[in-house]
Amino acid sequence: SEENIVLAYRNICKSKGSFTAGVDGKIITDIQKYPIQTVVQKVRNKLNYYQPKKVLRTYIDKGNGKQRPLGIPSIWDRLIQQCVLQILEPICEAKFHERSNGFRPYRSAQNAVAQCYKMIQLQNLHYVVDIDIKGFFDNINHAKLIRQIWAMGIQDLKVLAIIKAMLKADILFNDIVISPETGTPQGGILSPLLSNIVLNELDWWVASQWETIPTPVSYTH
């Protein structure tokens, strides 16, 4: 809708990442020169037969001395990703586990720590499981992800087709074009939400195995 595109445009304008150019060299100021109605029409035209530009891959340093791959979409693709995010996020937020805190609105590591304290005090839970999935973002299975999005209740075929196109967008790195079979680039606006969709089943399973599993002892306080 026009309202969704305008809201996405306003959110993109407030993002520092919008001043980082993708493969076409354009940033948010290149969009801001157009009247808002022109921006809306351009987005609508792109969505009719959506084909994203290549994602520019770069690397940033991590705290442990290693590097993390970062995918930078073109500014117009960032705007379209924001439009899709605003459609998906309210639906998915209602389905995510209450203990999930990563990459979610109004949640942080502080929320996770507070939840841990509460579970220790009220539920007598004292174990922490530390899991690190190697190369997680780069190894997400596209077909399974689309099925998980469908299971979330997002079943509009046009929206799903746009997400598929985003996932299959070519990656440009050092003049080499890579056609991804798996993964979603870190740096994309939609990637954090997609990663949470992938992990949602795991969140609920972990809770069923520890937090909510019936115990032979009834704890009282």
Kindly label every feature range from the protein language model.
Residues 25-31, 100-106, 132-137, 182:
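Conserved short loop/turn motifs at secondary-structure junctions
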Residues 18-27, 71, 110-149:
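Conserved catalytic palm subdomain of right-hand nucleotidyl-transferase polymerases, strongest
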Residues 32-44, 150-154, 194-212:
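A short, contiguous, amphipathic alpha-helix enriched in charged residues
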Residues 220-221:
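Conserved small/polar residues in nucleotide/adenosyl-binding loops
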Residues 96-104, 211-216:
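Short, glycine/acidic-rich hinge or "gate" loops at secondary-structure transitions
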Residues 67-96, 182-209:
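Conserved pre-motif C helix in the palm subdomain of viral-like polymerases
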Residues 42-66, 75, 79-87, 114-122, ...:
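Reverse-transcriptase-like RNA-dependent polymerase core
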